[in-house]
Amino acid sequence: MTLRLLFLALNFFSVQVTENKILVKQSPLLVVDSNEVSLSCRYSYNLLAKEFRASLYKGVNSDVEVCVGNGNFTYQPQFRSNAEFNCDGDFDNETVTFRLWNLHVNHTDIYFCKIEFMYPPPYLDNERSNGTIIHIKEKHLCHTQSSPKLFWALVVVAGVLFCYGLLVTVALCVIWTNSRRNRLLQSDYMNMTPRRPGLTRKPYQPYAPARDFAAYRP
């Protein structure tokens, strides 16, 4: 009789422990190409039956509370986030979905869902799951977009400088050609300029004394 009572007691406690355990299912890995992600936590319990508190934790030891929301079957939960994160959420009978945005590479980590049933008693929470590794990929799009812009900017600057240098060279050549032509014309004008009129020098004639014709008169 005593053994039978002991067996019934152990069976009762095992049923109670099993009933008080809430299992949670999470995706093992989420790879994020953008800066947003939705993480769904499915529980083996009807969430609408009680007032609950749903939380999302970051880290192997669940050190950082990322997002938390309180709700029940009469009103939607109000989610609030850690200062480092931006989050919102939604729920149905067995699922709580956390939405995170403005994520960066340093947010890559393992995340755990937790559910706590606050009222009516008894207090219940879920068994620790294996968690979800959220991997945020580093963006290279900005670099690939900025490189062509930088390239074309350099091309435009080089083109402007080339055109400016070409114009300056042409202008200097024209100025040099005109200057050289003017010097040649001035030299020709100087050679063709007539001399100023003056006294002309008479040709030299040898001296011959004038004859006195009166002396020969009779």
From Swiss-Prot:
Please give the biological process terms from Gene Ontology that the record holds.
Answer: apoptotic signaling pathway; CD4-positive, alpha-beta T cell proliferation; immune response; negative regulation of gene expression; negative thymic T cell selection; phosphatidylinositol 3-kinase/protein kinase B signal transduction; positive regulation of CD4-positive, alpha-beta T cell proliferation; positive regulation of inflammatory response to antigenic stimulus
A GO cellular component annotated for this chain's UniProt record is: external side of plasma membrane
Name the keywords, alphabetized.
Cell membrane, Disulfide bond, Glycoprotein, Immunoglobulin domain, Membrane, Phosphoprotein, Receptor, Signal, Transmembrane, Transmembrane helix
Question: At the top level of its lineage, which domain of life is listed?
Answer: Eukaryota
**What is the consequence of disrupting this locus?**
Cd28-deletion mice have some defects in germinal center reactions and antibody class switch recombination, but in principle are still able to mount cytotoxic T-cell responses to certain viruses. However, T-lymphocytes show impaired responses to lectins with a lack of interleukin-2 (IL-2) production.
Q: How is it modified after translation?
A: Phosphorylated by LCK. Dephosphorylated by PTPN11.
Which loops or segments lie on the Cytoplasmic side of the membrane, by the record? 178-218
Chain positions found as Phosphoserine: 187
| Segments traversing the membrane | 151-177
A UniProt-annotated Pfam family: V-set
Q: Which residues lie on this side of the membrane: Extracellular?
A: 20-150
State the membrane topology.
Single-pass type I membrane protein
Q: Which PANTHER family match?
A: CYTOTOXIC T-LYMPHOCYTE PROTEIN (PTHR11494), T-CELL-SPECIFIC SURFACE GLYCOPROTEIN CD28 (PTHR11494:SF7)
Q: What does this protein do?
A: Receptor that plays a role in T-cell activation, proliferation, survival and the maintenance of immune homeostasis. Functions not only as an amplifier of TCR signals but delivers unique signals that control intracellular biochemical events that alter the gene expression program of T-cells. Stimulation upon engagement of its cognate ligands CD80 or CD86 increases proliferation and expression of various cytokines in particular IL2 production in both CD4(+) and CD8(+) T-cell subsets.
**Subunit comment for this entry?**
Homodimer; disulfide-linked. Interacts with DUSP14. Binds to CD80/B7-1 and CD86/B7-2/B70. Interacts with GRB2. Interacts with PIK3R1. Interacts with PRKCQ.
**Designated name of the protein:** T-cell-specific surface glycoprotein CD28
Species annotation: Mus musculus
